[in-house]
Amino acid sequence: MSGSVSPLAPKTFAEMPALRGVRMATAAAGIKYKNRTDVLMMLFDRPASVAGVFTRSKCPSAPVDHCRQNLPGGIARAVVVNSGNANAFTGKKGREATRLTAEAAAKAVGCSEAEVFLASTGVIGEPLDATKFAGVLDKLAASATQDFWFEAAKAIMTTDTYPKVATRSAEIGGVKVAINGIAKGAGMIAPDMATMLSFVVTDADIAPAALQALLQAGVEPTFNSVTVDSDTSTSDTLMLFATGAAAGDGQAKVEDAADPRLDGFRAALDDLLRDLALQVVRDGEGARKMVEVTVEGAENDAAAKRIALSIANSPLVKTAVAGEDANWGRVVMAVGKSGEMAERDRLAIWFGDIRVAVEGERDPAYSEAAATAVMQGETIPIRVDIGLGSGRATVYTCDLTKEYVEINGDYRS
């Protein structure tokens, strides 16, 4: 957890309502940090539907393997998350730590280990001492309450400077339902399935298969469209749970994601995921500016996204943003190296509303002062027209500052 809050942090935080069917508690287990909570336990009063997306890293953490193994069952009764240790690249010791944690959680809750989901975040390669959970999970299960979202978000922070929370409401068949979510992430963030840790819960009654389809569709334009440093974590986990408590209000269970009754819910879920994803970008390690990169006129949407990511992940583009330098030549460079089709003499580039380049050269009406004024803002919009087709995509990133180097140079100390 950083000592100073990001200047891009929300000015106010969402008031997180209690959500029926789920309770939470946190504790300080001393996994790495001192004088702060580092374990979160989330309990479901009744079996909840569960969906999840995870890192595509070829070196996934032991908790990710555990979640993937349990996900096909479609049911969750408990989630245990720890910060300070990723339990990744820890071999047999890591798998044993995961087994012991799931076993202890299942015993505390009174459920099967197959209904327990785990996540860890922190240093890679350090064995996780699961004995630190001894006695802790029993106490958490006994003390869990419904209105603990903000504290839950704080417990899973690492280099984050503020807790990330969001809430939305919707209607399904005329019955009001709520959606609450938390996330953590500030570094090692790149679009690849989930790109950090996030846990979203609704009191809607939705079957696991429908929930999975909703999550997979919602993640692409949100968490899969943000990047801080182009590095994909070994531990990326995004999970969505449905407690089904709204059935008590007369909400009929939804089995199919294509059911039109889910239209409002889908929109609310997508909006919440976008909110959390942008909070992650705004808390990028050392970030002082957020960057919105939009590419249009590419061969197709996939090509547009790859070009946008080439721009967003370019250290030269990101340092130019940090220095408030309207260096559109670096954007040209990033387009050219993307591997996608681009015609140099058709390119047009805008910083905000200021067109800085057109038809392969600097705009004849280019104003350094006007472009610099855009770069001095807190949010920097960069738009590129490739001039070839109708493909379009938007991704979000942040600047690259000296503080990023300092934070990551000192991370293990």
UniProtKB/Swiss-Prot annotation:
Active site at: T195 (nucleophile)
* Gene Ontology biological-process annotations: L-arginine biosynthetic process; ornithine biosynthetic process
Q: In which pathway does it act?
A: Amino-acid biosynthesis; L-arginine biosynthesis; L-ornithine and N-acetyl-L-glutamate from L-glutamate and N(2)-acetyl-L-ornithine (cyclic): step 1/1; Amino-acid biosynthesis; L-arginine biosynthesis; N(2)-acetyl-L-ornithine from L-glutamate: step 1/4
Q: Which residues form a coiled coil?
A: none
Q: What is its EC number?
A: 2.3.1.35, 2.3.1.1
Keywords, ordered alphabetically: Acyltransferase, Amino-acid biosynthesis, Arginine biosynthesis, Autocatalytic cleavage, Cytoplasm, Multifunctional enzyme, Transferase
Site (Involved in the stabilization of negative charge on the oxyanion by the formation of the oxyanion hole): give the residues.
Answer: T121, G122
Site (Cleavage) residue list: A194, T195
The GO terms describing molecular function are: glutamate N-acetyltransferase activity; L-glutamate N-acetyltransferase activity
Kindly give the SUPFAM superfamilies that the UniProt entry links to this protein: DmpA/ArgJ-like
Q: Supply the enzyme class, top level.
A: transferase
Q: Which cysteines are joined by disulfide bonds?
A: none
A Gene Ontology term for the protein's cellular component: cytoplasm
Question: Is Acyltransferase among the key words of this record?
Answer: yes
- Annotated compartments: Cytoplasm
Q: Which Pfam families does this one have?
A: ArgJ (PF01960)
**Binding-site residues for substrate, renumbered to this chain:** T158, K184, T195, E285, N408, S413
Q: Which reaction does it catalyse?
A: N(2)-acetyl-L-ornithine + L-glutamate = N-acetyl-L-glutamate + L-ornithine; L-glutamate + acetyl-CoA = N-acetyl-L-glutamate + CoA + H(+)
The main place the protein resides is: cytoplasm
Q: Does the keyword rRNA-binding apply?
A: no
User: What biological function has been recorded for the protein in this entry?
Assistant: Catalyzes two activities which are involved in the cyclic version of arginine biosynthesis: the synthesis of N-acetylglutamate from glutamate and acetyl-CoA as the acetyl donor, and of ornithine by transacetylation between N(2)-acetylornithine and glutamate.
Quaternary context: Heterotetramer of two alpha and two beta chains.
Which family does the record assign?
Answer: Belongs to the ArgJ family.
What this protein is called in its record is Arginine biosynthesis bifunctional protein ArgJ
Q: Which organism is it from?
A: Rhizobium meliloti (strain 1021)
